[in-house]
Amino acid sequence: MASTLAPITSTLAAVTASAPPKYDNLWMLILGFIIAFVLAFSVGANDVANSFGTAVGSGVVTLKQACILASIFETVGSALLGAKVSETIRKGLIDVEKYNATQDLLMAGSVSAMFGSAVWQLVASFLKLPISGTHCIVGATIGFSLVAKGQEGIKWSELIKIVMSWFVSPLLSGIMSGILFFLVRAFILRKADPVPNGLRALPIFYACTIGINLFSIMYTGAPLLGFDKLPLWGTILISVGCAVFCALIVWFFVCPRMKRKIEREVKSSPSESPLMEKKNNLKDHEETKMAPGDVENRNPVSEVVCATGPLRAVVEERTVSFKLGDLEEAPERERLPMDLKEETNIDGTINGAVQLPNGNLVQFSQTVSNQINSSGHYQYHTVHKDSGLYKELLHKLHLAKVGDCMGDSGDKPLRRNNSYTSYTMAICGMPLDSFRAKEGEQKGDEMETLTWPNADTKKRIRMDSYTSYCNAVSDLHSESEMDMSVKAEMGLGDRKGSSGSLEEWYDQDKPEVSLLFQFLQILTACFGSFAHGGNDVSNAIGPLVALYLVYETRDVTTKEATPIWLLLYGGVGICMGLWVWGRRVIQTMGKDLTPITPSSGFSIELASAFTVVVASNIGLPISTTHCKVGSVVSVGWLRSKKAVDWRLFRNIFMAWFVTVPISGVISAAIMAVFKHIILPV
């Protein structure tokens, strides 16, 4: 029997010896590609908010538009900029020469690193925690290396540099964003007429954005476009030339068109929101001063009470109507700050006006009419269009801090919804099924009601960035029922913090400024998406590149360039994650941290994207999450210290520190299984 099997055994041995040795681990390569795609998916789901979160938060683009633009620029950025950072991830963290005799161990380590990073990022995305993809892959790489080779396989000096960059990147990006926003606010926003200065600055902003973007592409030396053959002076010359050409195009063609559009929009200025009824002239003001008996014959949404004292000029106003709950629980006079309790009429109307620091007139009225149910009342806030009350109300809905608006009423806040539209759905009176009942009560009991009367008969006109995303989601539900019950906090802030609310109104964009900056924010968001694709695709593809090149060459120190198709593979995975789960973290980055306006969003996007692109070009794998969070917090703090949700920022900061050990532990566990069970000793 043995003599019969001997020829067969010798033949199989000869075939095995003649077969390429790389096919021995084909299963590991296939598994690596699958896990790498899942990792890219998780990167897109978690880090996409870094690119378009602020643009969606300010209402410049809708979520669908953001996904389309991000898909394009993420993919292009991953192909053009991702190769150099992938080299840092692949070779910069560990000493690959330690694996010369054990290539299989390095391949298993790459699979383990991708698995550990993917698992934690998926969990974090599900929990809506904005973590750093760079943190994940760095921690996972260190985890498998400790198991495979111990401390000798890790370049601790490179790790220290990377850890330092985690702290430097948010600080540097925050400083740059703060300086840029300070200049924009000083020379544009706070001017009596911001349009002339804004139009003058427009060519400069566009030139800087285009010039920086082109320089980053060419300086990286994208082989696909032949830029690796350009000398440094040629790169600078082409970038500056394109920037100047772009500035001339904007100055001679875009600026005149923008000026005409702004004049046309400001002159016509239709209603911006279903909750806002515009008052354009003195006649409208006078008509609102009517007898108490006439109140029931008018639409509550259109009621406006003029400020006491002489009227300086006809100001453009909006009326916001809210039904706030029981009169017994929240007395009328306790719902307004002390400086607003100027006059109380017999008919139950409280009149008041506040002069903002920038001259805007904010008026308030609280009326109890026969039309209102005895269990509640309406509160009308008539505000200048340029004030921040509308954004304040949006902000209060998602801040969800008990007592911020209703004093010590003890009401529970509105629960944050998975969709970024939950805030606007609540504001517009659209169906929202994510509520929180009071403690000890059944869900739905004693809910406050936010009502928009006659909502089904009103037509909404998409006007500017303040309400563009609100209008977009409302169009889908034009025939739906508009009355709803929302457990929400509404108002002007608690009695002790009214001055802080007025401080936040100071830097709200005027409508013409919104029109001026919304195009810039779209451009800078695309720039940020491009930079994000170049930097963060390495987090998903870096280990896969190492796995693939070792499999192909059987040389751990190979000098072959990163294949472009591998970078595109990662870009596709990032885009899929963006479309499926991207909105979850957009809610945190674009809305929860601080209210975003087009001008502040532009400053955040441009400065943080510049920081990321510079870091990508020098091969330093910094965190785009850190850069964007640093910019958002910096600009929010510069606008108003109370505009930043410091509790949320604290939670994000804590999540940054747990990411490295968690991903490292998962990767180390998988590597231990590979080393001691799966791979032969």
Curated annotation (Swiss-Prot):
The keyword rRNA-binding does not apply. Disulfide bonds: none annotated. GO terms for cellular component: plasma membrane. The keyword Phosphoprotein applies. Ubiquitously expressed. Pfam families: PHO4 (PF01384). The modification Phosphoserine is found at residues 269, 273. It is found in: Cell membrane. This is Sodium-dependent phosphate transporter 1. It comes from Rattus norvegicus.
